[in-house]
Regions:
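Feature captures hydrophobic
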Residues: 1-78
Length: 78
């Protein structure tokens, strides 16, 4: 998974003339997002909600900043 993700990160950075380092995910970020995706898929009954809710959290973080853990918790109502 990580090799594919690294290539996707490099491709994304190149498409917006940025550094791949700008899109680096820590292991904690990966764990948070995978847990959010799991919750979204299981609680909603629709697997398609998993990537969409992760995208929404990414939009919120990009537009307003904030701690990823706090945004994930708010998203799932904790």
């Amino acid at each position: 998974m990580h090799e594919w993700l690294e290539q996707a990160r490099a491709n994304l950075a190149g498409s917006v003339e940025s550094s791949p380092a700008d899109y680096e995910l820590s292991q904690a970020d990966v764990d948070e997002l995978l847990e959010l995706a799991r919750i979204a898929a299981h609680e909603s009954g629709e697997r398609t909600n998993a990537p969409l809710v992760c995208y929404l959290v990414g939009l919120a973080r990009g537009r307003h900043g904030g701690d990823l853990s706090a945004l994930v918790a708010a998203t799932v109502g904790k």
